[in-house]
Amino acid sequence: VDLKNPSNRIQEEVRLPSGRGKPVRIAMFAGGEMSAKARAAGLDVIDPMTIEDLGGNRQQARKMANRYDFFLSEIPHMGTVGRFLGVVLGPRGKMPRPVPPNVDPAMIANGLKDTAVVRSRDKITFHTALGSREQGLDDLTLNAMAIWNRVMGRLERGTGNIRSCYVKTSMGPSYKVEVIT
């Protein structure tokens, strides 16, 4: 697969059937009534008035980007977020998802809590979290198969494109998974 061609790159959000096994941190750029809904949903709310200040303070913007896994934003604030925080959030793949005025942010947040992001960028390797050590082997297997099936669906030759597959814990050794083509 030629990943220099952007159409061959993969960026997928996979819904994990057994969840991520750890809490997900989600923030929302919102004001007024929508910020009250976001707080009620358990989201951290970032006031739209501070977006410009964060854009001027690169270090604070990076800390914020690293603190949260996903971002949501009211549609009117998307342009401001892109202008001031796009250089920080964009390369991390954390640009906010727009939330229409008639949609409850809790619905979107609940969907993101069980989501893993699979990105290839311009390298031929994928790195993604599929769960935590506290989950059982059956749960981790279900999550791994969900990710595997989604990635295989995107590759033109399926398993023929896979040279090797490894599974590892954060600080543990890696184990090779046999890929049968």
Walk through the language-model features, giving the residues of each:
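Short flexible coil/turn linkers enriched for glycine and charged/polar residues
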Residues: 20-22, 32, 121-122, 159-161, ...
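Ribosome large-subunit tunnel/peptidyl-transferase-proximal elements
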Residues: 3-5, 31-43, 47-50
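Translation machinery proteins
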Residues: 1-34, 57-58
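Short acidic, glycine/serine/threonine-rich loops at helix termini
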Residues: 39-41, 83-85, 140, 176-180
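Long, charge-patterned amphipathic alpha-helical coiled-coil/hairpin "stalk" segments used as oligomerization
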Residues: 48-154
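Flexible, glycine/charged-enriched surface loops at secondary-structure junctions
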Residues: 154-166
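Residue-level signature of catalytic and energy-coupling elements of molecular machines
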Residues: 38, 90, 167
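Flexible glycine-/small-residue-rich
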Residues: 30, 130-132, 169-171, 179
